[in-house]
Amino acid sequence: MFIEKTNSSLVINESTLFADGVIYINNEQWLLAYSTFAYLCKSNKERSIALLYNMALCHQAAQEYAEAIALLNTAKMQLKSTAVLSHQNKVPSIHLLTDEYHSEHYRLALSEAAVALNANIIKLRIQRLLLDLHIVLENWEEAVRLSALPDMDKCKNVQEALILIKSKTTT
């Protein structure tokens, strides 16, 4: 139970609430996800990469694109400055990497463990989501810049974005 009533005050278990928020995002229950992660962002001065990413997904669903971009940029900077990269796992199979590139897994919520163990993939997911947001906002130059980052050319959404950009900018 994530909310316990004690002496007419509520005590919220934030770990359980975070896990519930991940489930809400992955089931596209955006109203519930948004309120969950907004609460967690408000109650935590130090926001984790996973929290920032998940809140950015909620902002994207709410069409609050500038807020989503700001959170993703913060998460990207935090990823660069943490020791998370020292815990990087090797990907066991090229097939799993190919699946990552061709899927929309980057639109799913992140757990803290996923960030801690897969920093390079998380960085790629942040960049892919940023690209999608800049495409929606028709920020073609930034979208092209993002698409040129390492491994982005292998991603299905990036390939599709480049085709769209070409059609929009050559007419």
Task: Tell where the protein language model's regions lie, with residue ranges.
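"A position-specific structural signal for the A-helix of alpha-solenoid helical repeats
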Residues: 15, 19, 54, 122-132, ...
